Amino acid sequence: SGIAAGAGQAQTLLWQAQVEDLLAQDTLLQTEVFGPLSLLVEVDDEAQLKAVVKALQGQLTATLHAEADDGPLAASLLPLLCEKAGRVLFNGYPTGVEVCDAMVHGGPWPATTDARGTSVGSRAIERFLRPVCLQNAPAALLPPALQDANPLNLLRLVNGQWTREAISSPH
């Protein structure tokens, strides 16, 4: 079913699936969809609901719609949802992504290829970084950030201690 879209709008869709198909890892049901779509899966009990959540692949977001008296069920679902999504919303919709330090717009695979990062916010630059070790590199070849003299006055972790001091040569 769906509501016809107006000019410049996406059509809203509501799909229904059998719980058995979702638990059997049906690829169509496991494909992340962007846009106004909801998938309705009716479960028999709390155990089946938890099995459905466990069967989900990684997602950017997961939303839990609950009322105050749903507290125990919500508390038991939260750890499962945290394993499946980079951002868990409560009684809300993931349509607005604020660009801020705390925002996480990522999640476990296949939502992202690296769940440690985010594509939004101040930490998004980390997606383009990767660690490289320069083991036993000659001092003349080291970039300024790695030189013993610390010419950039960077805060660095040296032998387990944070410091801006130059590293004295052991020779």
What does each of the following model-derived ranges do?
Residues 1-60:
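NAD(P)-dependent aldehyde/semialdehyde dehydrogenase
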Residues 3-14, 59, 63-171:
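C-terminal segments
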